[in-house]
Regions:
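A short glycine-rich, His/Asp/Glu-containing loop-to-beta-strand
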Residues: 99-127
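Asparagine-centered strand-capping/turn motif at beta-strand->loop junctions
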Residues: 192-195
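N-terminal secretory signal peptides and thylakoid transit peptides that target proteins
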Residues: 1-16
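Glycine- and acidic-residue-biased ligand/ion/polar-headgroup-sensing regions
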Residues: 139-140, 144-151
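Short acidic-glycine-tyrosine-enriched beta hairpin
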Residues: 159, 163-188
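C-terminal segment of N-terminal export signals and the immediately downstream linker at the start
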Residues: 22-61
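A short hydrophobic beta-strand segment most commonly corresponding to one strand
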Residues: 142-144, 197-210
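Conserved short histidine dyad/triad with adjacent acidic residue
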Residues: 121-136, 185-188
């Protein structure tokens, strides 16, 4: 069973306390009638790749590489038009200790199914706020910088314990406009972003519950800076709730 954007929004809202990121689809009117043929082709390719991922025809690491390649070929102006960037940027909300996210509706584009296999979002952040350190299970996602600068940290998820995750740092870099990052269960599972300018806008897609027979629970938040340093650069990081993650990492 494919989890819908609306179901994911409801689940996240319940499990992440006051995680007021995701708003109703009827508040965003970013429809496909403004999408150019190039971007429409890109959207169709993205949907095809995600269907292949869900059907087990490609691995999650292949999905990551191909999504990154697709985005590198899309003209930024076309992408901004496709998501109705002007409207979304004007109505964006900027919480004090985390990002905000608006749903982007591509469902009326020609050549696409009524319900996509991935969920697209528009993220907004004020300077100093963060997408707190977290990982996922049974999910893949992509973030693309649309405006501003952010710092990105990524980690491999080495092992799980009830109260800890052992992780290996893989990326520690600044991102500018056009930069793309991806995560999955099998490559760079954990990520963390901090806005270096204001505003920061990102395009995001999430592929939730890739394997319908396995659990999906949103975000696994951790405390990497307070973690135990192990040999070979590994960190044993404590699992934390979203409220504590916001307190520790949400604002700097």
């Amino acid at each position: 069973m494919k989890i819908s954007r609306r179901t994911f929004t409801q689940n996240m809202a319940g499990s992440l306390l006051t995680f007021s990121l995701l708003k109703s689809l009827d508040k965003v009117d970013a429809l496909a009638n403004t999408v150019s043929p190039i971007v429409r082709k890109w959207l169709i390719e993205m949907e095809h790749l995600t269907q292949q991922l869900r059907q087990g025809q490609i691995k999650s690491t292949e999905w990551q590489s191909q999504i990154e390649s697709l985005l590198s070929r899309v003209d930024l102006k076309d992408l901004l038009t496709a998501i109705d960037f002007d409207k979304l940027s004007k109505t964006a909300v900027f919480p004090e200790d985390h990002e905000s996210a608006e749903d982007v509706d591509f469902s009326q584009n020609k050549g696409l199914p009524g319900e996509l296999s991935f969920a697209p979002y528009f993220y907004a952040m004020k300077k100093g706020t963060a997408i707190v350190p977290h990982g996922h299970r049974n999910m893949a996602s992509m973030h693309m910088m649309l405006k501003g600068r952010s710092h990105c940290w990524q980690f491999e998820r080495v092992s799980d314990e009830a109260q800890y995750l052992t992780i290996r740092p893989t990326e520690d870099k600044e991102l500018g406009v056009g930069a793309v990052t991806t995560v999955s269960d099998h490559r760079t599972n954990i990520h963390w972003f901090r806005a270096l300018s204001e505003p920061v806008f990102m395009f995001n897609i999430g592929v939730f519950r890739i394997n319908p027979s396995e659990a999906f629970n949103g975000r696994d938040c951790i405390d990497p800076l307070g973690g135990e340093k192990l040999k070979d650069g590994l960190i044993r990081a404590r699992r934390i709730e979203i409220k504590e993650a916001y307190a520790l990492y949400g604002k700097s």
